[in-house]
């Protein structure tokens, strides 16, 4: 009987954690992602206009956003719902638009900007989420 109970418990746990849902079926409430239909904090995988993993309502790991036509719009990493590490945004033609880094949800260091042909047009230097220097090419 114990083995059967353990089996069903593990099925429930795996099923709960491995839920996959379209991003449009989620909503933000108090800084957390909730399943719109059942109004519960979501844990699982998200696909659609944004793809990534959610743990206890917070984005985790690598995430990607997409234009309506399916081309990549942005890619970056999250830790407990905050942007961290390298962040890249793209023009609709697939060329990089901007690239920089986040730390604890805040832009830091040099952020570079590019035109639709991929030519660098500017750099902005961030400190404490504020642009301290702009350099135009």
What spans do the regions from the language model cover?
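Glycine/tyrosine- and acidic-biased, solvent-exposed loop/turn segments at the edges of beta-strands
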Residues: 14-137
